[in-house]
A protein has these predicted regions:
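Intrinsic-disorder-associated, low-complexity terminal segments enriched in Asp/Asn/His/Tyr and depleted
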Residues: 15, 20, 49, 57, ...
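GHKL/Bergerat-fold ATPase module in large chromosome/replication-associated machines
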Residues: 205, 223-246, 267-271, 277-555
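Serine residues within intrinsically disordered or low-complexity segments
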Residues: 6, 43, 53, 68-73, ...
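GHKL (Bergerat-fold) ATPase N-terminal catalytic module, capturing the glycine-rich phosphate-binding loop
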Residues: 76-81, 86-273, 281
Length: 555
């Protein structure tokens, strides 16, 4: 890539003599103690050829690109063999017994209450997700003619009653019959969403595990369900349970409005969930982009020295977030407005990347390169992961390559595997594919900006380089691409790719071993005397004062 040249770095102060005194004639006298050497070799295969020991030791041996896995497969033990597909077979003992593990139902609710979810507040996300599922199912059935008439208001409503210590979630979805309550509520881990998806494919249904409803027992001593199916002739059903395997269920003679109402009688240690402000905060955290309107109380206005309720519903969410739309329909200003919606106190981003892929996995989203005003503002965990517009987590290290956790934005994918609580990522081949896809999209976007908008790219380089340098140091695939759009800046404020710079200085700064010698300073003002001495000899000097520049010099 660089004509076989390797780079040798020289700082302005050192204890070592340069290898080629002829090239640096007079340099030692001018610079006091001479020049320190630091090497960073380049090769055709990839940008930075060797890791410094500090960086190298942070990478497991089996992941190092230049060190193949030398582990040997263990030989089969006695009693083992290999099947035709190469897999090891265990020889079964005549005393082996097959059976089923017994589960004591009396013990399952304490487990659910304490350990099912990492955060108890997630119960609200689960209940709202179920309500949205029911509404989306109703819309699907209506679109194919299985539901007659107008659907009316399909908002999901959340209400608190501090006096009664209750929290109520109501939807106007498909509702349930007594048989369906028995099937989907009385049998833990049987998900109605799974069955519905099998029948009506290609519909955005959130639920997967059938345990979401039972998360309500983490905060409630008693839970009641009132439900009315959309089906003609179906009776309303009332169901209640106090957190034991015993429940009560009855059909009601009086028909109710279509849909389901869930009433949580909050336990003494969960009274905070009867506060409107607490619920609003949780809804904004988990449900701000759900595809069905979520109503929580009334819009407030300032009147007579205090806030009072108006008659207008307080809709928490944006049902059509920007990432669900086609990029061709979105303006630059709309991308910036969405960024401000996500991060109200931040400066406008440098640029964005719109993700949209349907095969071999489903993934949409928008990633932003934030403008970092100073070195103390670098923060991770600013990318939000959603599944069908339901917030899951902002801990995305398993999906997004480590260096891209510095970015901001949103990723939405129903194909990212989650455990039963949806709070932690599971190992899966799709995750690796998604990570590779995101890396490629980021590299392609940077290359596009560099090629088509070079001047603008250079103007933003001081803000961009922290992301690109971190990527080169931590991601080999990204490093292979990044050398084409990575820049070096000299003390005159001019920018060059490594290849461009090597071509410019090779005549003046190549030693007898055909090694290209690069000079740098970390503070041009403080090292002004040294700079003038270097320039007097016809040398060009780079400015290396970024947070990660030392890592490059040590490579």
């Amino acid at each position: 890539m660089f004509g076989g040249l390797s780079f040798r770095w020289y700082a302005e102060a050192t204890d070592a003599e340069p290898e080629n005194p002829a090239l640096f004639c007079g340099w030692q006298r001018t610079f006091g103690t001479g020049c320190q050497t630091r090497t960073a070799k380049m090769s055709e295969k990839r940008g930075w050829h060797t890791l410094c020991s500090k960086e190298r030791n942070r990478i497991p041996k089996h992941n190092r690109p230049d060190e193949p896995d030398r582990s040997l497969s263990k030989a089969p033990k006695k009693g083992q063999g290999l099947s035709r597909d190469g897999k090891r077979n265990e020889k079964k003992s005549d005393k082996m017994k097959n059976g089923k593990i017994g589960v004591t139902t009396e013990n399952i609710f304490p487990v659910i209450k304490k350990f099912l979810y990492s955060d108890h507040e997630i119960f609200l996300r689960e209940l709202i997700s179920n309500a949205v599922d029911a509404t989306q199912k109703l819309k699907t059935l209506s679109s194919i003619g299985e539901v007659k008439g107008e659907l009316g208001d399909v908002s999901v409503r959340v209400a608190v009653d501090p006096a009664k210590k209750t929290l109520t979630v109501t939807d106007r979805g498909i509702g349930m019959t007594a048989e369906e309550v028995d099937k989907y509520i009385n049998q833990i881990a049987f998900s109605g969403a799974e069955e519905f998806m099998a029948k009506y494919q290609n519909q955005a249904i959130i639920g997967h595990f059938g345990l979401g409803f039972y998360s309500s027992f983490m905060v409630a001593d008693k839970v009641e369900i009132y439900t009315q199916s959309y089906k003609e002739g179906a009776k309303a059903v009332h169901w209640s349970c106090t957190g034991t395997p015993e429940f009560e269920m009855e059909e009601l003679d009086e028909r109710r409005d279509r849909g389901t109402t869930i009433v949580l009688h909050l336990s003494e240690d969960a009274q905070e969930y009867a506060e409107q402000s607490k619920i609003d905060d949780l809804l904004k955290k988990y449900c701000r982009f759900l595809p069905v309107p979520i109503v929580s109380g009334k819009v407030k206005e300032w009147k007579d020295g205090k806030y009072v309720d108006t008659d207008k519903d307080n809709v928490i969410n944006n049902i059509e977030p920007l990432w669900t739309r086609k990029p061709t329909e979105i303006t630059e200003e709309q991308y910036k407005e969405f960024y401000r919606e996500l991060y109200p106190m931040s400066d406008d981003p440098l640029f964005y990347i719109h993700l949209n892929i349907d095969y071999p996995f489903h993934l949409t989203g928008i990633l932003y390169f934030p403008k970092i005003r100073n070195n103390f503002e670098i923060q991770k965990n600013k990318i939000q992961l959603y599944s069908n517009q339901v917030f899951v987590t902002d801990q995305v290290e398993g999906i997004v390559p480590e260096y891209l956790t510095l970015l901001h934005g949103v990723i939405d994918s129903p194909d990212i595997p989650l455990n039963v609580s949806r709070s932690y990522l599971q190992s899966d081949s799709n995750v690796k594919k998604i990570s590779s896809y995101i890396t490629r999209k980021v590299a392609d976007r940077l290359q596009e900006l560099f090629t088509t908008m070079r001047a603008d790219y250079e103007a933003k380089w001081d803000d961009l380089k922290i992301f690109i340098q971190y990527g080169i140091l931590t991601d080999e695939k990204f490093a292979e691409k990044a050398t084409d759009f990575m820049l070096w800046k000299n003390v005159d404020g001019k920018y060059f790719t490594p290849k461009e710079y090597a071509e410019m200085v090779k005549e003046q700064q190549t030693d007898k071993n055909k090694t290209l010698v690069l000079l740098y300073v970390d503070d041009p003002v403080e090292k002004h005397t040294f700079l003038e001495a270097a320039k007097a000899k016809g040398y060009d000097v780079l400015e290396m004062n970024g947070q990660l520049d030392n890592h490059y010099i040590n490579w």
